[in-house]
């Protein structure tokens, strides 16, 4: 919210880079001095409202006000032993449109805010469509919480699948479930399901690992196999795009998958087992990023260890070289 940058360090500290002072702040240090307890930070989830959840080892989690924490204030411990968190393992934290915070744990859902939901079910994925929260567990369970009725109900998924790997809201009406048996779409408008097989003549995997919808409403799916699949839902067009094997820059280990649109509207993709590329919408091809446009061999495709998108539409890459 404030433009500062969270930086979990290699040795488990939660450092906040203050863009005004241009200094790093070890946020948990004052708390550790006071409590004589050292934390090892696993990950940090920053919410749009200006609150961060600092998730540590051994069931310790801290909710931090991103302004007050710079002064060692506004930090609250959440855990099973302080009895304000359902489980000791947090899958994700989500902010809904009312700015309530949903914490999904291995033993149920905790909400910080005005809502309440009584469930011990270990949901792992969450998203919102209009006034409904959708909760999903990897074993194929789907539930809906309605803001108006304040009730949680399970929804039967009639499409064959064993596992849900990821979810995404498509537009304002559709929930997409990435499964081990293709893409399952649920229409919130009429409660109808539709299953899409992502296999093509060049791509035999129906296992969906990641879903993304671009501004042109195309849906992009990462399969297990090399490449990425582009889906145009209205026309049922399906296209497998990949980096030719003889052009793949090998790093000895796998890069993270990456897809985003920059502020000029260019779609960038780092497909499974491929090179960093941009999508040429006219030619419908992935094209490599060249450091010298006159030299087709000057491909720039680093090993991406981590990445983050900033509020200006830039993508920051943490590579093997920095």
Residue ranges and their predicted role:
Residues 1-322:
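Carboxylate-rich, polar loop motifs that coordinate divalent cations or form catalytic acidic clusters
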């Amino acid at each position: 919210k404030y433009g500062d940058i969270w930086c979990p360090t290699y040795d488990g500290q939660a450092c906040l880079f203050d863009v005004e002072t241009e200094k790093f702040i070890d946020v948990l240090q004052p708390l550790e001095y006071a409590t004589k307890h050292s934390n090892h930070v696993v990950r940090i989830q920053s919410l749009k409202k200006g609150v961060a959840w600092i998730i540590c080892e051994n069931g310790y989690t801290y909710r931090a006000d991103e302004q007050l924490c710079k002064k060692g204030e506004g930090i609250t411990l959440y855990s099973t032993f302080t009895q304000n968190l359902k489980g000791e393992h947090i899958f994700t934290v989500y902010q809904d449109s009312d700015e309530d915070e949903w914490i999904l744990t291995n033993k149920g859902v905790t909400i910080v805010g005005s809502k309440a939901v009584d469930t011990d079910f270990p949901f792992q994925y969450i998203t919102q469509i209009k006034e409904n929260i959708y909760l999903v567990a990897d074993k194929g369970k789907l539930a809906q919480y309605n803001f108006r009725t304040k009730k949680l109900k399970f929804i039967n998924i009639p499409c064959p699948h064993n596992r849900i790997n990821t979810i995404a809201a498509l537009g304002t009406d559709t929930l997409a479930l990435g499964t081990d048996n293709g893409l399952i779409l649920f229409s919130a408008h009429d409660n109808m399901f539709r299953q899409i097989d992502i296999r093509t003549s060049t791509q035999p995997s129906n296992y969906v690992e990641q879903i993304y919808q671009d501004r042109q409403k195309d849906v992009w799916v990462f399969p297990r196999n090399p490449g990425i699949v582009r889906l145009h839902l209205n026309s049922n067009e399906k296209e497998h795009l990949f980096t030719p094997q003889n052009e793949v820059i090998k790093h000895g280990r796998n890069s993270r998958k990456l897809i985003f649109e920059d502020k000029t509207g260019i779609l960038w993709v780092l497909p499974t087992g491929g090179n960093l590329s941009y999508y040429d919408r006219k030619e419908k091809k992935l094209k490599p990023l060249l450091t010298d446009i006159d030299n087709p061999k000057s491909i720039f495709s680093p090993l991406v260890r981590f990445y983050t998108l900033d509020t200006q539409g830039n993508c920051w890459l943490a590579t093997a070289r920095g």
